Amino acid sequence: MNMNHLILLAESGSDITPELAEENGIIIVPMHVSFGGETRDDGSFPVPEMFEFYKKHRELPRTSGCTPHDFEVVFERLDREYPGVPILYLAYSSCTTCSMQSALIAAQGRENVLALDTKSVTAGQAAIVLTIARLLREHPETTLEQAADAAKGLIARVRMGFIPGDLDYLRAGGRVSNGAYLGAKILGIHPLIEILDGKLISTKKYRGTMKRVVMQMTREFPAAQNLEKDALWLIYGAGLGEDIMREVEAHLHEQGCQNLTWVQTGCVI
């Protein structure tokens, strides 16, 4: 996409792949992951490496948002390469990270930068960013204000939920108690985590195998949230079986859902 007209910006936590970012002219600002005594850019190493570190050391990797310096580096490069071109920054939920605040600090004095909180993470954010990228590709005359208005409409409509494969990382990070963790393990309980007004909230509990609860969510979530059937974005993490993914697709197609897009979660979520 031609970035001489309008530039889209998002964090690596959107889980937009480098290939999709390049194809759609999206600038990705790295978030960060700390483990093993060092801090690395999210997306600069394979996700399984982080899981293996935790299994070996039982030390939870820490994630952190983009710093003002991260954004300053990007803004300065864009100033050199595309002077004066408007920048629309579609931010990872500001309830969960400091990234948006960092961007606002770095953008001080730059009148060409407009920031919007997507109130979403991972695939929810990706859906908004990539949909706006498609709008700009199909309608290159779109102004910054028009793109921002379109993004606001998407932000209001996005509904997102996911089911963790297990609660080890949530327990290690202090997000669930030991009692709740043990109860979930014994009873085979899997919480549904929804993104509500930018926050990660447990809204429902499923019981059974991962395959069973994923299929139950697939049956219930689209109808409960009145999701539009012409485009669904599906989130998966390392370890989700191909058989489950194919069954999910088949079931959603039976419901009349089209244009299914899978997004693999990275380290941050």
Q: For each predicted feature, which ranges?
A:
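An N-terminal domain-start capping segment
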Residues: M1-H5, V74-E81, A91-T97, R175-Y181
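Mixed-charge interfacial surface used for oligomerization/domain docking
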Residues: N2, S14-S34, P86, S99-L114, ...
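N-terminal glycine-rich anion-binding loop in soluble enzyme alpha/beta folds
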Residues: I7-D70
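Short catalytic-loop micro-motif centered on adjacent basic/acidic residues
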Residues: L8-L9, R62, Y89, A115, ...
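A general structural signal for short secondary-structure boundary/capping elements
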Residues: F53-E59, L78, R134-E138
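Glycine-rich phosphate- or other oxyanion-binding loops that anchor nucleotides, phosphorylated ligands
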Residues: H57-S94, Q101-S102, A148, I155-V158
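Short beta-strand->loop
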Residues: A91-S93, L116-K119
